A protein has these predicted regions:
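FIC/Doc superfamily catalytic core
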Residues: 1-273
Length: 273
């Protein structure tokens, strides 16, 4: 187990020419999406639609699969007795996302919010694990990583992560920091279950906290599904070789591609008769 996971910030050059060039294009795509949603008087319906799709995609990464049809039926009749367990789990994710969005208006993103998101996603009342965590496996079912298994280490690492999220020493671009935060949370893997989903909610909440978005509209799950083996390879390369470059470029590309895709989808929704 990786009990000696290095604390943040990473001892590596995060602002290479290649990374900075990609940061510019990712920020531009994100700013265009931000500008468009900012101009909408009432984007709530749009946000509900997009967040339902994210809940579905993010859960799919964890092999919790439902159909759009089941999802929208359950969303419009949440008290129905015939909702499948998978669909319920997807709806819990959506609720957790909106809960987090409302919470970060009042307090900074940190350990307490992480635990509350876990409670919402998994509908259970325990918290940071005391037992060995689930290993991370790639698309071929090979173990790529075994997270820390000592609760004191987990709490120490989470406390360090919380500090990194809220104190930007060195004035590093928030999108580069997003990649670092996502890597670190995935590696700490603090909960008995639901870590991937909680981590992906943290991504969008961080962008909102950094004022790069006003509302939870950008989700990386569909990109991760499409490029899943690259995701695990880049993650593993940081752990094994301290190669941050490919991981950061992967996350920056995910932000850029997803921002453009989301904006196209919104424009289509708002301009179609």
């Amino acid at each position: 187990a990786y009990n000696n996971l290095p604390i943040l910030p990473p001892h590596a050059e995060l602002e290479t020419v290649q990374i900075l060039k990609k940061t510019v294009s990712a920020n531009k795509a994100l700013a265009e999406l931000h500008g468009w949603t900012y101009m909408q008087a009432n984007p709530l319906l749009l946000l509900q639609t997009v967040s339902l799709q994210e809940a579905k995609s993010s859960s799919e990464i964890e092999n919790v699969v439902t159909t759009n049809d089941d999802l929208y039926k359950a969303f419009s009749a949440p008290d129905s007795k015939i909702i499948s367990p998978s669909t319920k789990e997807v709806l819990h994710y959506k609720d957790a996302l909106w809960y987090g969005f409302n919470e970060i208006k009042q307090r900074p993103l940190g350990i307490n919010i992480f635990i509350e998101l876990f409670h919402k996603v998994k509908q259970r009342s325990d918290g940071i694990r005391s037992l060995p965590g689930t290993v991370l496996k790639n698309s071929y079912d090979e173990t790529v990583y075994t997270p820390p298994d000592n609760k004191d280490d987990i709490l120490r690492l989470l406390s360090n992560l919380e500090n990194y999220i809220n104190v930007n020493e060195g004035n590093i671009d928030p999108l580069i920091r997003l990649a670092v935060i996502h890597y670190q949370f995935e590696c700490i893997h603090p909960f008995p279950d639901g870590n991937g989903r909680v981590g992906r909610i943290i991504n969008v909440l961080y962008l909102i906290q950094e004022k790069l978005l006003d509302v939870p509209i950008l989700y990386l799950s569909s990109y991760i599904i499409e490029h899943k083996s690259d995701y695990y390879k880049a993650l593993q390369d940081v752990t094994e070789y301290a190669d941050w470059t490919n991981w950061i470029l992967y996350i920056l590309d995910a932000v850029e591609v997803t921002a453009k895709k989301t904006l196209s989808m919104i424009c289509l929704l708002y301009t179609s008769p």
